[in-house]
UniProtKB/Swiss-Prot annotation:
Species of origin: Leptospira borgpetersenii serovar Hardjo-bovis (strain JB197)
Family: Belongs to the DNA mismatch repair MutL/HexB family.
Protein name: DNA mismatch repair protein MutL
UniProt xrefs under HAMAP family: DNA_mis_repair
GO MF term (any one): ATP hydrolysis activity
GO terms classed as biological process: mismatch repair
Cytoplasm recorded as keyword: no
NCBIfam families named among the record's database cross-references: mutl (TIGR00585)
A GO CC annotation given for this chain: mismatch repair complex
Keyword tRNA processing: no
Domain of life: Bacteria
Function: This protein is involved in the repair of mismatches in DNA. It is required for dam-dependent methyl-directed DNA mismatch repair. May act as a 'molecular matchmaker', a protein that promotes the formation of a stable complex between two or more DNA-binding proteins in an ATP-dependent manner without itself being part of a final effector complex.
SMART domains assigned to the protein according to its UniProt record, in alphabetical order: DNA_mis_repair (SM01340), MutL_C (SM00853)
Pfam family name, one: DNA_mis_repair
Length: 596
């Protein structure tokens, strides 16, 4: 017998499932899309144990004809296309005929479906893709699909899945995306028997956005629309005061299909230009309509990516759509708007969404100040040592820390360009970045306090309210105990806010809101161990509380920074990996001046 043999249909389906079905959220996506293609106006989604134990999708769509029940579970069997011409003009969500067969091949699946004017419906069961049961049941209109023990026959796949909480979030994100695509459909989501959300059908997209993300979004959305050259676009973008420090608030749909645009995020940043800080990313909910023959949706197994016939033309259209509204939404020029946005006083700070951040968390510069505006900031005449840690004593900082032999400062000579400390070390000359050096000091100080749980809790005179979406609030409350491990105590306030009443003593009053927002953003959707939480919090505190470029430092403070830096475990890098100092040995200097 030859070595090359044809694979069994079951194995072929399992291999195909590996491309289409990443985890439970992929099953939810495929089944919701089938429901949409069937004309459903109501949909219930249920999951248990992150969808691995159970997934159930129920819709009121047109149902499946009795003679099509069995073929529906076969690979490459579909009612949506017949020839290549149909594929070129496809508008349905699904068209390959892979989803049900792939899902059935890696689960125990039960499919029930009925059509109009029929007294009976049909039920079919399969185990690992093999039909085990088929029977008539009382009639109804629509489809119910039950998926149990996902990946029961592919245990390796189960090993690579994340925690139940992580899988639950992915399912919520999938339903959220589909609910944005179809505001006219009622969605209900239940996880482990608990109602996550009920979204009534809406007459417009904005109401659906508010349903999902919170009432605080309503006043920060700018409506966009443009029609040109066979392209039509509608939707909403956030005003420049309302943004996230990651891209998870950006949703793009083409012909109703949620997709990832190759340069979408880059185009958005370009459209907003300098209206946002470097780490700011706007929200967007954009809906494009285009002749299906001008777009290829068949380039990705999960249909996440698409290809445009005229990509350059689409990118130009995308950019114009955003810039047109940004220009018309304000009476001031872009330059004036930039200066207004990038130079607020502390009193103008406002946080309208959980992940809105009002400073460049990694830029090393003062909040919302661009490089060219730095010289206009009033210079501090001195710097408070308390921001660097408790007292002048180094005992708390140096406990159990071996002094790093590669950086032993002798004396400093001053500061160059209001940023770089010039100092003589034991074996040469050093240039130290005052911001990154203080970041390293603060990072190790806070990390040590967290690891030893050696910090107190101080009440706030005025509690801080943080506006969030309903889902964000639930995510925070689900992680309440984790956050309390780093001294963050957040309680619900209504349906779309949380309140902070006390802070850990390693934070300085006045900086706590931005630190906590940054911390929540960095932990969003991530599984984190206790040491990882400590590391993230220490980085957030260090980044926000460290002295900045341009801060005027007295001689005693300069000496204290150098002394404390020398006791750090890793004095040569800030927590984000940037260098804190550059050193030239005496030999280096003598070679530069040809003395050697």
């Amino acid at each position: 017998m030859g070595k090359i043999q044809e694979l069994s249909p079951e194995l072929i389906n399992q291999i195909a499932a590996g491309e289409v079905i990443e985890s439970a959220h992929s099953v939810v996506k495929e089944l919701m899309e089938n429901s949409m293609d069937a004309g459903a106006t109501q949909m219930d989604i249920e999951s248990k144990d992150g969808g691995l134990s159970l997934l159930r999708i129920t819709d009121n769509g047109s149902g499946i004809d009795p003679e099509d029940i069995e073929p529906a579970l076969k690979r490459h069997a579909t009612s949506k296309i017949r020839d290549y011409g149909d594929l070129e003009n496809v508008l349905s969500y699904g068209f390959r005929g892979e989803a049900l067969a792939s899902i059935a091949s890696v689960s125990r699946l039960t499919l029930e479906s009925g059509i109009k004017n029929q007294k009976t419906a049909w039920k079919i069961c399969s185990i690992g893709g093999k039909i085990s049961e088929k029977e008539e049941i009382p009639g109804f209109v629509g489809t119910k699909i039950l998926v149990e023990e996902l990946f029961f026959n592919t245990p390796v796949r189960r090993k690579f899945l994340k925690s139940v909480r992580s899988e639950d979030k992915k399912i919520r994100d999938r339903v959220t995306t589909q609910a944005l695509a179809r505001h006219d459909v009622r969605f209900r989501l239940f996880q482990d028997g608990k109602e996550v959300f009920v979204l009534p059908s809406r007459e417009n997209k904005k109401d659906r956005i508010v349903d999902l993300f919170g009432e605080n979004f309503r006043d920060h959305l700018l409506e966009v629309s443009l029609e040109r050259g066979g392209l039509n676009a509608t939707g909403y973008i956030s005003d420049p005061d309302f943004y996230k420090s990651n891209r998870t608030g950006q949703f793009v749909f083409v012909n109703g299909r949620p997709v990832e645009i190759k340069y979408g995020s880059t185009l958005l940043k370009k459209a907003y230009d300098e209206l946002l800080p470097p780490n700011g990313h706007p929200y967007c909910f954009l809906f494009f309509e285009i002749d299906p023959s001008r777009v290829d949706v068949n380039v990705h197994p999960a249909k996440k990516e698409i290809r445009f016939l005229d990509e350059e033309g689409f990118n130009g259209f995308f950019l114009t759509l955003i810039q047109k509204e940004l220009r018309s939404s304000t009476p001031v020029s872009f330059l004036e708007l930039k200066k207004r946005l990038l130079r607020p006083t502390p009193e103008t700070f406002k946080t309208s969404s959980l992940y809105q951040a009002h400073s460049s968390s990694r830029s090393g510069e003062s909040p919302l100040l661009s490089r060219e505006l730095f010289t206009e900031v009033p210079r501090q005449e001195g710097f408070d040592l308390d921001r660097m840690g408790p007292g002048a004593s180094l005992s708390a900082l140096t406990d159990n820390v071996v002094k790093h032999s590669s950086f032993v400062p002798k004396k400093h000579f001053g500061v160059l360009f209001e940023t770089f400390i010039l100092a003589e070390a034991e074996d040469g000359f050093c240039i130290i970045d005052q911001h990154t050096a203080h970041e390293r000091i603060r990072y190790e100080e806070v990390l040590r306090k967290l690891e030893k749980k050696n910090y107190g809790i101080q009440p706030l005179l005025t509690p801080i309210r943080i506006d969030v979406s309903k889902q964000e609030q639930e995510d925070i409350l689900n992680r309440k105990k984790e956050y309390e491990e780093v001294g963050i105590f957040l309680d619900p306030l209504g349906e779309d806010s949380v309140v902070l009443r006390e802070i850990p003593a390693y934070m300085e009053p006045g900086e706590e809101k931005e630190i906590i927002l940054d911390f929540l953003n960095r932990t969003e959707g991530k599984e984190t161990t206790e040491p990882e939480l400590y590391d993230l919090m220490a980085k957030c505190v260090a980044c926000r509380s460290a002295i900045k470029k341009g801060d005027h430092l007295s001689d005693p403070i300069l000496a204290e920074i150098l002394n404390r830096l020398s006791y750090c475990e890793n004095p040569s890098r800030c927590p984000h990996g940037r260098p804190t100092l550059v050193k030239l040995s005496r030999d280096d200097l003598e070679r530069m001046f040809h003395r050697k």
